[in-house]
Amino acid sequence: MFAVIKAGGKQYKVDRNSVIKVEKIDGELGSKIQFDQILMIGEYSKPSFIGTPIVKGAIVTAEITNQLKDNKIIAFKKKRRKNYRRKAGHRQELTELKILDITKQ
């Protein structure tokens, strides 16, 4: 069974026991969270349920396995011949989740 969830403004296709990285979700390691914004749910051998915009009664349960930071992204601006240079770095904070269960009531 698979589902398409919405987390942090992005969409992720998840299966049971899959591990995904989403934008930071506050919580302690090992704590369980539930996603109720499920956009699509289905099985590979049967037709899928597509939400309008979400599937009612569908819940995805996940466990927080890690809190980490992504690689640094450099933003650099320059104007030629004017000695104007600006450099900024950014590291996005991420949460690693393990999908435990996908249910539809």
Swiss-Prot record:
Function according to Swiss-Prot or TrEMBL? This protein binds to 23S rRNA in the presence of protein L20.
Instruction: Name the protein family.
Output: Belongs to the bacterial ribosomal protein bL21 family.
GO CC term (a single one): cytoplasm
Q: Which PANTHER family match?
A: 50S RIBOSOMAL PROTEIN L21 (PTHR21349), LARGE RIBOSOMAL SUBUNIT PROTEIN BL21M (PTHR21349:SF0)
Instruction: Name the lineage.
Output: Bacteria, Pseudomonadati, Pseudomonadota, Alphaproteobacteria, Rickettsiales
Q: What is this protein called?
A: Large ribosomal subunit protein bL21
GO molecular function terms here? Answer: rRNA binding; structural constituent of ribosome
SUPFAM superfamilies hit by this protein: L21p-like (SSF141091)
Keyword set, alphabetical order: Ribonucleoprotein, Ribosomal protein, RNA-binding, rRNA-binding
Q: Name one GO biological process term.
A: translation
Could you give the subunit structure recorded for this chain? Answer: Part of the 50S ribosomal subunit. Contacts protein L20.
Write down the species: Rickettsia prowazekii (strain Madrid E)
* InterPro entries hit by this protein: bL21-like, bL21-like_sf, Ribosomal_bL21, Ribosomal_bL21_CS
